[in-house]
Amino acid sequence: MSESSTDEKEGWQEAPEQPEPPRVRGDSPRKTVLPADADLGKLVHDSSPEILTAVAADARLTEDLALALLNHQDLPREALEALSKNGQLARLRKVRMAIAVHPRTPRHVSVPTIRHLYTFDLMQVALLPSVPPDVKRAAEEVLISKLASISSGERVTLARRSSGRVAGALLLDKEERIMQAALANPQMTEVSIVKALKAGHGTELLAPAVARHQKWSYRNDVKAALLGNKDTPSDRLIHLAAELPINLIKDVLRSGRLTTQAKNSLLAVLEKRGVKA
């Protein structure tokens, strides 16, 4: 070897290696483990997906820091999943709610989380415009399944303020004040009322109320459903029948779900109009 090359070798020094962040043994290299002295208060605002996921999984994370982390609208799905598995922290009410409604929470995380929410948290999930439709529907289904076990006062509040689908289920409540509150719900729909009237049971309070309702009793599909309901007051049958178009009267007659009195009322209307049944 030449003297010059030996001098070059002796004069050359290798740059010190930069230490890599600690990793989880035997797992994906992207799953960073935070050092013991990590400042979680700063790291929750980091832009690195790997750091945010590591923060979400850290056992030292507090409720306030978890909520700050969940304020990231672009929080990685991996971070949301890690947070949902973070022990007691993931069971806290506010954290659960924030995980359930976060736009990037995977469905296999959000739907099971929803099942553990409180009644009025479920109501909020179903009402928030930012929540995906399938997540809203899951919240509504859980809420409807709980109706039989929650208090009368809670059902009144739900009847007044919940989504149209939940209010629709409360149309068949055994308490008149709850049924009336559901009927007046701003999100109540004609479809929900017709569905409730066709339930076949539990309409003893609903049918008379709808038959005299200033808004809903004038809808043709509602009138048709009332004519097919055994609980519709007899003094309203002829008026409802008289207001229906001929084609709808014939459809109702063909349905075969009429009481004798309702059928006779419809036939009388057709006869008066000179139309054969």
Language-model regions: role of each:
Residues 2-277:
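Alpha-helical scaffold segments
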